[in-house]
């Protein structure tokens, strides 16, 4: 939500020591920073195509093959028996192409986006010194800038900026409630 890069290998080690599986929502990270599921140590990583400019409605779950995973729905043998239903082939192909494009120039694009993000942050901070950066200053995704502007209504600011800037005043799944991440 705020672009913070968590110390997954360390968290995974703690979980393993306690006999707990670890899931990480890697949708924001996939295609923007290197992701090696084995090095990260998470038992489950979820990905989403639309975060890569791919089609909406398709994602992937990478999971540790050593774990026994029980299906939530029963039916056909699709997706290794974990989820029944007809596979959405056009969405799968769109996801694969979006991933291929994102991964083909990941390092250079990440560096460029990081530079643009930092330039935007510095420019905003010079004009409005009371701005607050949400999350870690450096351990963050290159394409995400999450800020708080004290005393300014997020919805009013969003309405004023939305025709010129890709922005939001909350998460897509927030239902108008303040973010529990930002409130913590």
Predicted regions and their residues:
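Pyridoxal 5′-phosphate
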Residues: 1-184
